[in-house]
Structures are given as structure tokens and as C-alpha cells.
């Protein structure tokens, strides 16, 4: 009984902490941006089963937003080794499908290998839940939670990851760090870290000896072998394997599994037959009956948390205009795991020459990654200066700081993007169209503010009947007529 009370107290305390969480503020002048650029990755690390690309987190827009970005490509039968980070992260699946696992510390292993005949003495494998992922999925990874990912299909998997280094959960500095459990891979953000002189009076011989002992590159490789023998109760030969001794450097963070990975996981067909079980919306927080059903213990709040939510080409977008495009947003209201991360995401699709009207994010920075096609984008800062005026193309990233105004017009048949937001409940204010800032002002205020005649003020206020997505001009004329 005492343990149960302690667990409940822990949950209540954790809930309060998350409810009043905050982001660290960027350093002074980091958001005094006079010019933005559409950025491509500037570093690539090859591995046996794929590669990882990164954007420089020291660039001023990344420093202002307090985030780091990477893109991982997994080939057929490629396994990304388990790792965890010092800050929460969101992963968007741009392409492909496969399986992934995430380790919830302290939660039970609920997947069990079936007992085979004649193998009664062999211990059965038990592990935590394995999930399927597909194109368009958003995966939530809490701070310090180890996860792995595997591509079991022919199509390469492309996963874009955002790490929120400004999160209050990051107790280190603003440099992103990935802690691998195995392997001898290079840290993807290591080259961006400033090199500092080591203090102390350690001899050169001692330094070389320590470097040789730690050459494996993973968490386990740094421990003394006798420590691991004691901890795992295994012999020295197994410990050498755990520490990656004599492993080929080319393997890296992504390894190829010969013959494919054989693990216990629910079949994809089963998930497709019961999509409502995987994608069902979570209860309304105001529904007391719902709270009593879904929040009655640690297993049901943490260990069974839903970790993926599809926001790709969906049949039920949040905003839809058949002539302009669609927008789908994932927030903590429909994807509660995001309340742990204090992050959210938006998927958008724009038809050719359609426009996302000028708007701004009230309470979040926006990290826009172009998935497909190209669009003409303009961004304006608080001084009325156009800090970006150019094309955003597939594979490029554009960071729009909080309250900076932005507008986009598709230049291709179908421009698609995903926008990561640094708030789990972001708000957008549109400057034009229905329900916009100007639409909500009295005509007289518009007239006096912009020195317009009354009829002109009425046109500014009412001529655009659309809210966020505006069709091409030809379609607009037909609608107005």
C-alpha cells in the first residue's frame, strides 16, 4: 500500500512539473536576426547500414530556436543502434516503414517469446513493446528514453529528428548529445562542439592510456571491464563484445542485420485491421469519467503511453481547401505524449500557386522542413524587414522565430512540409482572410490605422473569404464571383 501511495505521489508531482514546465531563454541578441537562409545539412556520417546528416546547431537561427536537427537514412535490414539524448526529441518519418522500440525505465517487459517444443530449459525472451511506423508518423521520444529503429522493407527509411536543447529537461549545456549503448560510431554533433584545453596535470602517457581504454565510443565502452563483469554476471569475452573491442569502424551507428531481424512484434495487418486501437483520440481532460478510467496507475500513464501519431496525407486534416491544400497538426490535446516533450508538429500540403496567408506563431518557434516540391517563402521581423525572400526546396530547413510573420506560395504541383513547433499547444494568428487579425478589427479602426477610405477598409476586411489557405488567383475569382 505504501508503494502504491508513493507511486501516486510521484505521478502527481510529475504532472505538476510538466504542467508548469518552461523553455530556457536564448542568449541576448541570438534572435536579433537580420537575415534567414534555407539550410541544407552540412555534415554526413556514413555507417554500414545507412547514414546520418546534421545541420550545424551553432547557426544563429538554431541558437535562437534552441533546437538541433538531423536526418537519418536506413537501408534495407538496417538497424539504428539504441541511444538516448539529453533533451526531448520528435521524429518525423519522411519515407518508408519499419519497426521501433523505446525503453521505458521501470516498466515491465510485456512481449514474450512463445515456448518452443524441446526447449523447456531455455529462458524465454521478454522485452518491452515494439511498434510499427510508416510514412507520415510523428514519434515522440522523451528525454533520456533509449530507442532503436529498424527498416524491414525495401524502401529506404528517411527519418527527420528534432532535439529541443532549450528544454528545461536538458540539464547540460545547449549542445545536443547522443548516448549510444553500443558501437564505435562518431557523435553526429561532435564536430560542432568547441575544442577546449583540458585542465589538470594528467601525464601524456596517462591520457593516451585512457583514450585507448575509451576508444569504443559507446556508454559501455567507457567502463572498466571488471565493472561490467560484475554488473552483467558474464565473462570477459562477452564484456569485450559489449564494449565493441575489435569492431570494424565502418559499422557505425547503423548496422546491417544479415538475414533480417527476428523479434516479437504485432503483425502490420493486425494494426491495419484495428486502426482505431492505435490511432484513437485520447480522452478529453475535462471528462472526469475518462480520467478515472485512463489515469489510475503508473502502468496506464507511462508504460502504455501512445508514442506515434500520423499527420501525413490523412483523410481528416484540421484545415482543408480542395483548391488550395490541407494542414494537419499534432498537439498534446490529440497526442498526449507531446505534453512530456513540450513540442508539437504540423504537416502541410499546398497545391500549385496556392498560398498560406501571412501569419505568425504566437507562442512557439517554427522549424519548417520541406518534404516535397518547392515554395516561395517570405519572412518579416519586428522591424518590418524582409529577412527571408526566396525558395524553400525539398530537403531544406527554414527556421521562423516566434512572432516573425511568414507567408508561403507553392511553386510546384504539390509542396509538402513538416513544421516542428517548440510548444505542445501552439497558436497561430493569421494576418489576412477570415478570422484574421485585420478581419477582427472594426472598419473604422482599419480606416484610421492605414489611412484608407471606408470602402477600401471594407475590402481589406472582407474580400478574402478563406482563413489560412488561399487558392490560386484564378480560383479566387471564380469563388468571389
Swiss-Prot record:
Post-translational modification: During soybean germination, seed storage proteins are hydrolyzed by protease/26S proteasome.
Sequence ranges of Low complexity compositional bias: 193-204
This protein's UniProt keywords: Allergen, Disulfide bond, Endoplasmic reticulum, Seed storage protein, Signal, Storage protein, Vacuole
SMART domains reported in the protein's UniProt record: Cupin_1
Start and end residues of each Cupin type-1 domain: 36-240, 309-458
GO CC field: endoplasmic reticulum; protein storage vacuole
SUPFAM superfamilies cross-referenced by the UniProt entry: RmlC-like cupins (SSF51182)
Subcellular location(s) of the protein: Endoplasmic reticulum; Protein storage vacuole
PANTHER family (UniProt xref): GLYCININ G3 (PTHR31189:SF77), OS03G0336100 PROTEIN-RELATED (PTHR31189)
Protein name: Glycinin G3
Organism: Glycine max (Soybean)
Gene behind the chain: GY3
